[in-house]
C-alpha cells in the first residue's frame, strides 16, 4: 500500500503555508480579475498552490524546487498507476549491496549508510527511466520530489542541512509516497529553473508574487544536500557538513549591498497589473546574519516606481529550524502595488 503526501508536508525555511488564507484574503479584497499568477521565488510552491486554479508561472533558481514545481504544477499528463508501481519497487528494494556516490560521501552524516545507499540507487535509476523513455519529465520530477520529502522526514537534522546531529541515533526508514497532485491545471502553466531577474519579463500576468530571501542565510547552504541530489552531477564535497561548491548558486537578495538593486531591477522588468511582495522582518535578532536585508522604506520606494503601494501586516513566526527560535517579534508584511506606471 503506497501512502500519499501533499505539498504542505514539508518543513522549509520561509514556508508560507500557514499564511495562505491571509494572502488569499488580501488578493481577493484588493485585486480584480485575477486569472494568472506568477510565483517569482517559488520555494516549495505553497503559495502557488493556493492559486492553482489560475494560469501559473512558477520560478526558482534551485533545481530541487524546480522539480517540486514540475511535480505540483506542470500540465503534463502523468500515469499515477505507473508511479505507484515504481514507488512500491523502490520502497521494497534492498540497496544494501549498492555502493554509490551517496553512500561513499554521506554515510552516517544526515542518514545512515543503508539509507544513503538507497537514495543513491533511486536517484541513479530514476534518471535511467527518464533517459530510456519509461517516464516523462513530470513523472521523473514526481519521483524526485517524493524522494526529497522522504529524506526530510527522516534526516538527522533540525530541519535543514547546514549541519547534522552527531549522536549516531538514526531512526526511520526511507519511504517514498505518491504526490497528491491529481487536480486540474491550466495547460499554459510555465515552470522555470532560473534566476528570477533573468526571466521576469517573459510572461505577462495579472499578479506577480515576490517572496525573496530575507537575510544572509543562503538557501543553497541550508539545502545543499537536496540540491546536490537534484542536480546529480556528483561533485566533490567538503568539510564536516559535506557541502559542494555553491559559488554560482548564491542569491543577491541575501546580500545587503545587492538586495535593493536586485529588487529594483526585478520590479522594473515585471509585466503585471499587481505586485504582491511578502517580507518578514525576522524580529530583532542578536545575530546580524538573521536580520532582514531590506527595510520597509526601501521596499515601498522600489515598488512605488511602478504604482501605488498598500501595506498589510500580521504577526507570524515561521519555521526557522533552530535559528533564533526564541524570537517572538516576527511580523509578516504584504506590500501590494497596483501597477499604473
Where are these regions (language model features)?
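S-adenosyl-L-methionine
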Residues: 1-41, 46-50
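Conserved proline-anchored active-site loop of SAM-dependent methyltransferases
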Residues: 23, 37-51, 58-63, 203-222, ...
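Class I S-adenosyl-L-methionine-dependent methyltransferase module
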Residues: 55-57, 61-183, 216, 220-256, ...
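General small-molecule cofactor/ligand-binding pocket signal
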Residues: 57, 190-192, 310-312
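Conserved SAM/SAH-binding loop
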Residues: 193-198
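Conserved Class I SAM-dependent methyltransferase catalytic core
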Residues: 252-307
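Class I S-adenosyl-L-methionine
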Residues: 293-341
Amino acid at each position: 500500500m503506497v501512502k500519499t503526501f501533499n505539498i504542505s508536508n514539508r518543513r522549509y525555511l520561509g514556508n508560507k503555508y500557514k499564511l495562505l488564507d491571509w494572502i488569499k484574503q488580501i488578493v481577493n479584497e484588493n485585486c480584480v480579475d485575477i486569472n494568472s499568477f506568477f510565483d517569482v521565488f517559488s520555494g516549495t510552491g505553497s503559495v502557488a498552490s493556493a492559486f492553482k486554479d489560475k494560469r501559473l508561472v512558477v520560478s526558482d533558481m534551485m533545481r530541487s524546487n524546480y522539480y517540486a514545481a514540475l511535480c505540483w504544477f506542470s500540465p503534463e499528463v502523468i500515469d499515477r498507476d505507473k508511479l505507484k508501481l515504481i514507488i512500491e519497487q523502490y520502497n521494497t528494494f534492498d540497496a544494501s549491496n549498492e555502493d554509490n556516490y551517496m553512500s561513499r560521501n554521506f554515510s552516517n552524516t544526515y542518514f545512515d549508510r543503508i539509507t544513503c545507499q538507497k537514495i543513491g540507487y533511486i536517484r541513479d535509476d530514476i534518471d535511467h527511466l527518464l533517459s530510456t523513455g519509461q517516464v516523462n519529465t513530470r513523472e521523473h520530477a514526481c519521483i524526485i520530489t517524493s524522494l526529497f520529502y522522504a529524506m526530510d522526514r527522516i534526516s538527522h537534522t533540525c530541519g535543514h542541512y547546514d549541519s547534522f546531529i552527531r549522536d549516531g541515533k538514526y531512526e526511520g526508514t526511507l519511504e517514498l509516497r505518491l504526490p497528491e497532485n491529481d487536480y486540474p491545471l491550466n495547460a499554459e502553466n510555465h515552470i522555470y529553473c532560473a534566476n528570477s531577474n533573468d526571466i521576469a519579463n517573459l510572461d505577462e500576468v495579472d499578479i506577480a508574487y515576490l517572496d525573496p530571501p530575507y537575510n544572509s542565510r543562503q538557501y543553497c547552504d541550508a539545502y545543499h544536500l537536496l540540491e546536490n541530489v537534484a542536480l546529480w552531477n556528483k561533485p566533490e564535497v567538503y568539510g564536516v557538513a559535506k557541502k559542494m561548491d555553491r559559488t554560482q548558486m548564491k542569491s543577491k537578495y541575501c546580500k545587503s549591498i545587492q538586495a535593493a538593486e536586485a529588487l529594483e531591477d526585478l520590479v522594473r522588468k515585471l509585466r503585471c497589473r499587481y505586485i504582491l511582495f511578502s517580507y518578514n522582518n525576522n524580529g530583532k535578532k542578536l545575530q546580524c546574519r538573521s536580520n532582514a536585508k531590506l527595510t520597509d522604506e526601501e521596499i515601498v520606494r522600489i515598488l512605488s516606481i511602478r504604482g501605488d503601494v498598500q501595506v498589510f501586516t500580521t504577526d507570524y513566526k515561521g519555521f526557522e529550524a533552530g535559528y533564533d527560535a526564541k524570537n517572538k517579534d516576527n511580523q509578516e508584511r504584504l506590500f501590494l502595488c497596483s501597477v499604473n506606471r
